[in-house]
């Protein structure tokens, strides 16, 4: 991942700041420089916050990132654009905050865009899904990104010197090694469960074996004493239990068959004798009933004679019945005709009475008409009596209210005139207040500027004084440096190179003779004496070293002085002081006070006028309201007067009660008249209708009476003829025959029942005689007792068979269950044996006394150390390498780091390193960790890295080595940014991102050296 642009709003000291990382060339090393607290580390916080919603270090919380100078309505937000795997993305993350005037936080926002065809397209717009998208895109979580992207202050020194427990916590987060410990825990729990399950299976076998039935056999009972672990012997004894049970079952089944046959014979005998006994009893009873039936023969013969007579006189009886009915009808018709005559006379009398009553009612018609007209005319008033009463009651109240309103209205008019007179010479003037405000602002600005000028002048004078002092020191140090360089130049250095070659010269001398050719210069040797003064050369060499050392020291002092002078110049430029004419601040303050007084006086007048205008407005509003109220009340009064006048004019009453009494009386008179008139007319109509009906009924009755008399005469002639033929002498004989005819159905029914019963008894007696013919009856009680005894014997045998069968089946089921459990147990023991062993190994019971997670973490740590040593060897001049301390102990061992010193050929504790050496080891370890985390996170490549502080502890040579390491790192394809205050880095690093602060807001700018 390579940063391209970042925009920070209300983020730390940055109110609205944009950094363009594209100004950093590919593979370029750059320095981030600025005062302490200017916000250098906040740049890293902004990048990490944009990606993961958190700061670059764990100690900073999201709420700590918001600028204290941000306004209450603007959110904290970061827009971060970067490139990863040749794809360009942009993230806009906005933090939640409590907006000014609210009590709840706003919602966090996150939008992720991808650059496609030179346009950004939205990929995610929800916070949770967006966070997951970023983790999947980069392949690392926030903690891993911190280790890869940023090397924070002191973090890797802590990691280098930490114990195994602390390292485990860090490495566990980076490499997600907790899953290995979870595997171990799962395996341990699995083993525990399996052991419990195996014990449960043995318990199941024991319980099932104890439940096996022995059929009261002593030999089988001995087998029950086998232990649950003796599974092979159990399986061997299973068939013996089954064979013995089947043998007992067979003997009981044979006995059952014998008893069943005996019982069937007894049941058959009992059934035959029960039927014989019942048939004998039934035959005797049927004979008795048949004899009783024969005794009714005479009565049945008499009924047959009566039936014959009824059938022969059927026509005569019909004539007689019809004649009796006609005579009865004739009597009723005579009675009805007489009653109708009487009714006709009564109806005529009633009609005359109601006609007289109707004539009397017609005399009041004019009076009732006048009442009706009055009622119609005043019905509206009668229906609204409550409203009219209310009008009479409201009228004096409204008149009093109008009087009160006129009084208050006049009071308000008077008050308004008094206020107008009081404020006659007072006016509002906001323009003059604005003028005073502008003048006050200008004076305050001049006073503030004068005070600032005074402070700047004082600071400028101090800077000039300090600068002059440092320039004097610089001049002095440069003179000292020139003197030293002159001294070094004046020393004869021609033979200095021979200082360490005395032994070499003596060896050559011992091998040469006078007259030989010199192997160095090629001339003839004339003498072998001492031509070189090695002691003098050594003295000169020591003097040069002292001077060089002093020279380096003075140069360092010169660099520090120049840095201080440069800093003073920078501060002087920032101050940008120019001498100006001094102004009298006390006089300006007097003018300011006078203007404030004038402003306050005019504000008081404005306030007084505003108060008057407010009161005047209230009075005008009240007057207007009184006008409305008076108009409304007068309107109400007019409506009431109109309503009262209408009532009195139409009703001719000034009293509502009198009107109500008269109206009710008139209404009652009309209603009574109309009711009586209508009732009389209805009664006359009803009587006339009844009279017509009665006269019509008389006509029909006369006709029916004539017809009935004629039919009676005809029937009497027919009856006399029929009586002569049948031998009847009187109507009494005919009446007796008619009475007997009514019983015909009952006579026929009795005869039929007798005949049917007679035939049925004959058939049943013959059938029963055949059934009992030639058979002997046995003792039923003795047979029943024999059957009961045999049934008890059979039930007992069946119970024994069922019990034995159940025991055999139950034993068989338990045997099968035991076999299944034994098979499962054997399979589990084969598999779990290896799992038990693996569980112990992963739990630390091994030669290395390491758990699985610690073993994995050691693997990662050794990879990190291998990567770190490639750089540490270079930085330490092949002197140091990191090694893992190997110690065998159960627990969190094996993660401590020692350092191996090739000069002493021994390893030593990491704390024995100096500050600079510790920085070298920490930097190497950090870079190594970064490499390994990248490899383990799916090969994601972070094309950038930032290092925060740590270089101040290094000497010049070590610093150069560290810078070379970082230069090699950036040349491998990374953009490397360094935060540091070390001045040598400013000289060595060509590109600087300067962070400047003006007390409350910071700004950034790239600058090239």
UniProtKB/Swiss-Prot annotation:
Assembly mode: Heterodimer of SbcC and SbcD.
Pfam family, one: AAA_23
Keyword Nuclease: yes
Listed GO MF terms: ATP binding; ATP hydrolysis activity; endonuclease activity; exonuclease activity
Family: Belongs to the SMC family. SbcC subfamily.
Phylogenetic lineage: Bacteria, Bacillati, Bacillota, Bacilli, Bacillales
Segments forming a coiled coil: 397-499
Alphabetized UniProt keyword annotations: ATP-binding, Coiled coil, DNA recombination, DNA replication, Endonuclease, Exonuclease, Hydrolase, Nuclease, Nucleotide-binding
Protein name: Nuclease SbcCD subunit C
Function, as annotated: SbcCD cleaves DNA hairpin structures. These structures can inhibit DNA replication and are intermediates in certain DNA recombination reactions. The complex acts as a 3'->5' double strand exonuclease that can open hairpins. It also has a 5' single-strand endonuclease activity.
InterPro entries the UniProt entry points to: P-loop_NTPase, Rad50/SbcC_AAA, SbcCD_Nuclease_C
GO terms under biological process: DNA recombination; DNA replication; double-strand break repair
Name of encoding gene: sbcC
Annotated binding of ATP, by residue: 34-41
UniProt keyword annotation of Metal-binding present: no
């Amino acid at each position: 991942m390579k940063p391209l642009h970042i925009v920070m709003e209300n983020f730390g000291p940055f109110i609205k700041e944009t950094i363009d990382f594209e100004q950093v060339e590919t593979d370029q090393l750059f320095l981030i420089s600025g005062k302490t607290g200017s916000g250098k580390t906040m740049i890293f916080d902004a990048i990490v916050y944009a990606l993961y919603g958190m700061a670059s270090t764990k100690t900073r919380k999201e709420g700590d990132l918001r600028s204290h100078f941000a306004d209450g309505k603007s959110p904290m937000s970061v827009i971060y654009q970067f490139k990863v795997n040749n794809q360009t993305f942009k993230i806009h993350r906005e933090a939640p905050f409590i907006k000014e005037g609210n009590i709840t936080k706003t919602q966090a926002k996150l939008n992720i865009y991808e650059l496609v065809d030179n346009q950004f397209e939205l990929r995610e717009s929800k916070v949770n899904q967006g966070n997951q998208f970023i983790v999947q895109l980069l392949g690392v979580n926030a903690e891993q990104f911190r280790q890869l992207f940023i090397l924070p202050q002191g973090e890797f020194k802590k990691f280098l010197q930490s114990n195994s427990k602390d390292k485990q916590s860090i490495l566990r987060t980076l490499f997600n090694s907790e899953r290995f410990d979870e595997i171990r825990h799962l395996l341990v729990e699995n083993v525990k469960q399996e052991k419990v399950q195996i014990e449960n299976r043995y318990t199941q076998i024991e319980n099932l074996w104890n439940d096996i039935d022995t059929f009261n056999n002593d030999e089988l009972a001995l087998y029950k004493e086998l232990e649950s672990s003796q599974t092979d012997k159990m399986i061997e004894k299973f068939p013996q239990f089954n064979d013995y049970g089947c043998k007992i079952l067979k003997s009981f089944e044979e006995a059952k068959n014998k008893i069943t046959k005996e019982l069937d014979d007894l049941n058959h005998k009992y059934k035959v004798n029960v039927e014989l006994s019942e048939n004998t009893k039934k035959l005797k009873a049927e004979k008795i009933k048949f004899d009783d039936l024969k005794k009714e023969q005479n009565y049945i013969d008499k009924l047959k004679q009566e039936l014959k007579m009824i059938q022969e006189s059927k026509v005569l009886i019909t004539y007689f019945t019809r004649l009796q009915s006609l005579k009865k009808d004739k009597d009723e018709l005579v009675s009805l005709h007489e009653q109708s005559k009487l009714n006709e006379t009564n109806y005529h009398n009633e009609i005359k009475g109601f006609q007289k009553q109707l004539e009397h009612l017609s005399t009041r018609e004019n009076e009732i008409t006048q009442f009706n007209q009055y009622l119609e005319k005043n019905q509206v008033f009668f229906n609204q009596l409550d409203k009219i009463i209310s009008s009479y009651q409201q009228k004096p109240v409204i008149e009093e209210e109008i009087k009160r309103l006129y009084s208050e209205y006049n009071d308000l008019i008077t008050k308004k005139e008094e206020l107008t007179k009081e404020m006659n010479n007072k006016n509002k003037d906001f323009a003059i207040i604005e003028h005073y405000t502008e003048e006050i602002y200008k004076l305050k600005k001049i006073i503030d500027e004068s005070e600032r000028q005074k402070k700047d002048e004082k600071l400028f004078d101090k800077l000039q004084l300090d600068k002059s002092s440092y320039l004097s020191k610089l001049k002095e140090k440069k003179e000292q440096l020139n003197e030293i360089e002159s001294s070094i130049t004046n020393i004869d250095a021609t033979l200095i190179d021979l200082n360490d070659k005395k032994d070499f010269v003596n060896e050559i001398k011992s091998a040469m003779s006078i007259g030989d050719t010199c192997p160095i210069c090629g001339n003839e040797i004339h003498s072998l004496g001492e031509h070189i003064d090695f002691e003098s050369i050594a003295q000169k060499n020591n003097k040069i070293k002292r001077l060089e050392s002093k020279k380096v020291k003075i140069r360092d002092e010169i660099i520090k002085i120049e840095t201080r002078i440069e800093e003073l110049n920078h501060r002087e430029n920032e101050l940008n002081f120019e001498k100006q004419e001094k102004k009298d601040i006390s006089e300006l303050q007097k003018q300011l006070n006078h203007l404030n007084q004038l402003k306050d006086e005019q504000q008081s007048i404005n306030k007084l006028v505003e108060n008057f205008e407010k009161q005047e407005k209230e009075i005008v509003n009240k007057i207007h309201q009184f006008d409305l109220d008076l108009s409304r009340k007068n309107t109400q009064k007019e409506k009431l007067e109109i309503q009262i006048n209408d009532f009195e004019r139409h009703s001719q009453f000034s009293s509502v009660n009198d009107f109500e009494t008269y109206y009710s009386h008139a209404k009652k008179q009309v209603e009574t008249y109309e009711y009586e008139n209508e009732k009389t007319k209805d009664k006359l109509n009803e009587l006339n209708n009844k009279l017509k009906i009665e006269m019509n009924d008389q006509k029909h009755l006369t006709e029916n009476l004539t017809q009935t008399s004629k039919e009676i005469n005809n029937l009497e002639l027919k009856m006399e003829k029929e009586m002569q033929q049948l031998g009847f002498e009187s109507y009494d004989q005919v009446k007796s025959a008619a009475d007997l005819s009514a019983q015909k159905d009952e006579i026929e029914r009795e005869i039929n029942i007798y005949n049917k019963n007679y035939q049925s008894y004959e058939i049943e007696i013959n059938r029963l005689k055949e059934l009992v013919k030639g058979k002997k009856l046995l003792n039923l009680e003795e047979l029943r007792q024999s059957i009961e005894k045999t049934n008890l014997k059979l039930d007992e045998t069946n119970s024994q068979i069922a019990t034995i069968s159940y025991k055999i089946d139950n034993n068989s089921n338990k045997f099968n269950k035991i076999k299944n459990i034994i098979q499962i147990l054997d399979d589990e023991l084969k598999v779990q044996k290896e799992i038990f062993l693996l569980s112990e190994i992963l739990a630390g019971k091994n030669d290395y006394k390491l758990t699985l997670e610690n073993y994995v973490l050691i693997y990662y740590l050794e990879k990190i150390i291998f990567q770190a040593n490639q750089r540490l060897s270079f930085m330490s001049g092949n002197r140091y390498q990191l090694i893992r301390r190997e110690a065998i102990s159960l627990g969190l061992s094996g993660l401590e780091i020692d350092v191996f010193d090739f000069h002493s050929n021994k390893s030593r504790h990491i704390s024995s390193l100096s500050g600079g050496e510790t920085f070298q080891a920490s930097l190497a370890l950090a870079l190594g960790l970064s490499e390994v985390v990248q490899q383990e996170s799916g090969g994601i490549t972070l094309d950038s890295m930032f290092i925060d502080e740590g270089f101040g502890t290094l000497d010049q040579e070590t610093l150069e080595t560290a810078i070379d390491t970082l230069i090699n790192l950036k040349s491998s394809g990374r953009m490397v940014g360094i935060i540091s205050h070390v001045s040598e880095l400013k000289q060595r690093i060509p590109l600087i991102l300067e962070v400047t602060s003006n007390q409350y807001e910071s700004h950034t700018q790239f600058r090239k050296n």
